[in-house]
A protein has these predicted regions:
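Short, contiguous, well-ordered secondary-structure segments
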Residues: 1-3, 56
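General helical secondary-structure elements
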Residues: 2, 35-36, 40, 48, ...
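N-terminal single-pass transmembrane signal-anchor helix
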Residues: 3-35
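Intrinsically disordered, low-complexity segments enriched in small/polar residues
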Residues: 6, 29-32, 51, 104, ...
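Compositionally biased, intrinsically disordered low-complexity segments
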Residues: 18-20, 29, 53, 94, ...
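Membrane-proximal N-terminal amphipathic helix
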Residues: 39-65
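Periplasmic/extracellular, small/polar-rich flexible segments of pilin-like filament-forming proteins
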Residues: 56-168
Length: 168
């Protein structure tokens, strides 16, 4: 009496391995799309938070009649006096200092060196803010009258989000 062998043939095993390979390839592509979308959403959220924070803090100065203090850092230290609100780049500097703990969702550190902070002080030109190594950074600058916020979604000026609000 001959025993019947049990098991899978080589062809069956190869088919299973091929199916697993196809599923893995599709899953990696889909996962990559989800993570890039999440990073872009986080950068947009940082952008909106900067605008809301700066506007809310500047309104405090308006409520107090232009006196007192606004924009305190998380450690409670004063970053901007209401009397300096109209001074060139003072609102931007205070905003960057107050939101110092925001991290870059892309994890990109500038090619020139530096850190992984998401909110940075801009140079004063919306057209030149995004360059190599700036993906995920939100740049804040003001000219004394207008606060400009620009977020870079790639290392080029084409894929950005820009906003501005009046400095009051």
């Amino acid at each position: 009496m001959k025993k019947k062998q049990k098991g899978f043939t080589l062809i069956e095993l190869l088919v299973v391995v091929a199916i697993i390979g196809i599923l893995a390839a599709v899953g990696v592509v889909a996962y990559s799309g989800y993570t890039s979308g999440a990073k872009k959403s986080a950068a947009k959220s940082n952008h909106a938070a900067v605008l809301k924070y700066a506007a809310a803090e500047m309104k405090k100065c308006n409520i107090n009649g232009g006196t007192g203090s606004a924009m305190k850092a998380p450690d409670g230290k004063l970053k901007l006096s209401c009397s300096n609100v109209g001074t060139n780049n003072e609102v931007a500097k205070a905003t960057v200092a107050a939101l110092d703990d925001f991290k870059n969702p892309y994890g990109v550190v500038p090619a020139t060196g530096g850190d992984n902070k998401a909110i940075k002080l801009g140079t004063g030109s919306a057209a030149t803010a995004c360059a190599d190594g700036t993906k995920g950074h939100t740049y804040v600058f003001d000219d004394g009258d207008t606060l400009y916020v620009q977020t870079c979604f790639s290392d080029a000026t084409a894929d950005t989000m820009s906003s501005q609000t009046m400095v009051e």
